[in-house]
Amino acid sequence: MEELKPTKKSPLATLTNAELAIEKIMVMAKVRLKHLERHRTTCPDTKELLHRIEPIDNWLVRRMESYIEANPAYWWFSHVKGAGRELMSKLIGEIEGFGRYYDVGDPEIPPYVKREPEEYIILDEDGNEIVKKGIWVEGIERLTTPSKLRAYAGKAPGRKPQKGAKLTYNARLKMLTHRLEKSFMQARGSFYTFYGGYKDYLEDRVTTKDGKKVMPTPKARYCPQCDKEVEVKRARYCPDCGGQLSQKTEPPGIIYKGHVHQMAQHRMGQLFLDLLWHVWRESLGLPVREPYPVEKQEHTSIIRPEDMMDKSCGKKDCPICHGKDFERRQNESY
């Protein structure tokens, strides 16, 4: 039998797909055990399932983290507070998973992709293998503009679930971007500083331009069945009757602080995706473009990727931080 050689293609997309699937199973198993524990019971099979898949999940995370260093944008996001290795490996894996084969001569193939056609296998509806020939286009190569990455991540206007229609974005990438936003909030780094400034700008804009008043978000939500207000933070159903709670609707002329917070956090996530797109493509020598405000609206100020670098990657041989604290190193006179 012919000995097969290891492929040079990164398996990060495949590993990410497997890890996120196992993560979902682990969460379901833990929730089930927690629920049974409240009723003073347990399930040995669920415990055994968790015991068997946790080592696989740990192995997947370690392998994903080892591959993330090969990403062309690693030099940048490894110096950003809140962009942890595990989270970034999943996010990058989802973007890499956007790559696909195109038929030779397909007009959708970007002009800068010069790869030779190669054979690949697909399965038909009956599970039979079909050998085809096509040109491979990487995920970041397909995302020709920053707005396309935003749209793919569900961070563009109108990218919401529609009843009876297929999603127009990658739900898992949107979830991972939301996790990253939460991580930035906790890290209190450059992106958190941007969030704070943009939040102040939004509050000033809605009060001076739109004439609205910014009010604290009410804790209570109304239950029609119980005919009362219920104080819950994230629940959708009444803890007493189980009925669905009403949404928190803003009265005319009022905008809740929670709404402003979500808008600012959303913009922070968009900024990261824009900068990641720019660094990744520029490092590969792919065409890049200036941000929309600069290119179309003639703005003069711009946030560069280097402006958001605020931590050490921990490696002494790093040509950027030399293993030193990034903030302290910037204050040194040399």
What are these regions (language model features)?
Residues 1-38:
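Phosphate- and other anionic-substrate recognition elements at nucleic-acid/protein interfaces
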Residues 13, 20-27, 47, 51-58, ...:
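Generic structural signal for well-ordered, non-transmembrane alpha-helical segments
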Residues 30-86, 94-98, 102, 110, ...:
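Helix-hairpin-helix/helix-loop-helix acidic hairpins
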Residues 72-73, 82-118, 127, 133-142, ...:
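Catalytic DNA-binding helix-loop module of base-excision-repair DNA glycosylases/AP lyases
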Residues 124:
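Post-HExxH zinc-binding segment in Zn-dependent metallohydrolases
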Residues 127-129, 135, 139, 147-234, ...:
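A basic, often C-terminal nucleic-acid-binding module that engages the phosphate backbone, implemented
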